[in-house]
Amino acid sequence: MIPGTDAYDIAIEISDADIERLLSVMPEDVEAASALSYCRNVFLPLTTACRYTCTYCTYYDPPGQAELMDREEIRETCRRGADAGCTEALFTFGDDPDDRYTAVHDQLAEWGHDSIHEYLREACEIALEEGLLPHANPGDQTREQMAHVADLNASMGVMLETTTEVQAHGGPRAKNPGQRLNTLRVAGELGVPFTTGILVGIGEDWHHRAESLLAIREMHERYGHIQEVIIQPVVENERWQGGSPDLATMRRVTAMARAALPEEVSVQVPPNLAPARDLTDCGIDDLGGVSPVTVDHINPEYEWPALQELTAVAEAAEVPLSERLPVYDHFVDDGWLSAPIEAAIEADNDAGDRFRSILDRGVNPVTL
């Protein structure tokens, strides 16, 4: 049984036979995608406060050091992103900052907000005003928290990471796989197009990798809301010196993801963290969000590739490369979007023209 599922009343039955079948998949068993896509974004770390202290993560700052982005910085970053042709405002923060972060909560109160999710809603409003579509990844969320911001997001996300307990999540506030799965379920119940994924190399074994992918598949089969699954290797940084998975591991687990998931769910590898050129024959069809404006605030030591580098990956694979929105096309076509997001895409302005050009033709009118 997946740890924590009882506490959240999540019934997921994954048979040993299904796991064994998936474990038998190798790269030569899957087909390469016929095209690759990517999304142009700006990365906005709303706060670096987090109740977790994962040993592989450099994103969080301890109490007394964590900060909040102010409204002016959010607006200016979004404006720069729109000028650079970005379509996505990627908002992140550490999972719901706990009571240790007194300065963060005091600042939120001074700005007129009772919670970080209230501030996230205002940040999403700013992004829409500046011509970007919000995609929020605020970690674990309750139904109430997600419902408070879902209508102002084109899509949302949280990494499942793994279905097992690992030492890298250790400590008094360890991540709970059941709680992560509950967030995926809440997104499905609320009809939110959703991004999730697994972390490779944090202490899980092959059984857990297969189980994690099959758990994601089961959630998608119930609600149809998973738009992409990220296969992300853990990478070395100032807090993690435990090594990264080798190429053979990444090729095998990527192929397993492609085999486990239905065709409409994209398989993505982050091109600043994974050897994308060596994984195109393993079933990936997306290269994730990259930014011409901001750094990867979760992995700041690993620079985003330039568009020319993504083009080179596609050319090496002999497939076309196209740009996409932060919500995948079929969710737009099938009526998953909220009224504010639909209005932004249909707007008679530069942002609306940019969104529709990408949606209709995969081409951004703003060149880099």
UniProtKB/Swiss-Prot annotation:
Coiled coil: none
Record's function text: Catalyzes the radical-mediated synthesis of 7,8-didemethyl-8-hydroxy-5-deazariboflavin from 5-amino-5-(4-hydroxybenzyl)-6-(D-ribitylimino)-5,6-dihydrouracil.
Enzyme Commission number: 4.3.1.32
Class of this enzyme: lyase
Cofactor note: Binds 1 [4Fe-4S] cluster. The cluster is coordinated with 3 cysteines and an exchangeable S-adenosyl-L-methionine.
Record note on quaternary structure: Consists of two subunits, CofG and CofH.
Keywords: 4Fe-4S, Iron, Iron-sulfur, Lyase, Metal-binding, S-adenosyl-L-methionine
CC cofactor: [4Fe-4S] cluster
Record protein name field: 7,8-didemethyl-8-hydroxy-5-deazariboflavin synthase
Family note: Belongs to the radical SAM superfamily. CofG family.
Residues reported in the UniProt entry to bind [4Fe-4S] cluster: 50, 54, 57
Keyword Iron appears in the UniProt entry: yes
Pathway: Cofactor biosynthesis; coenzyme F0 biosynthesis
SUPFAM superfamilies xref list: Radical SAM enzymes
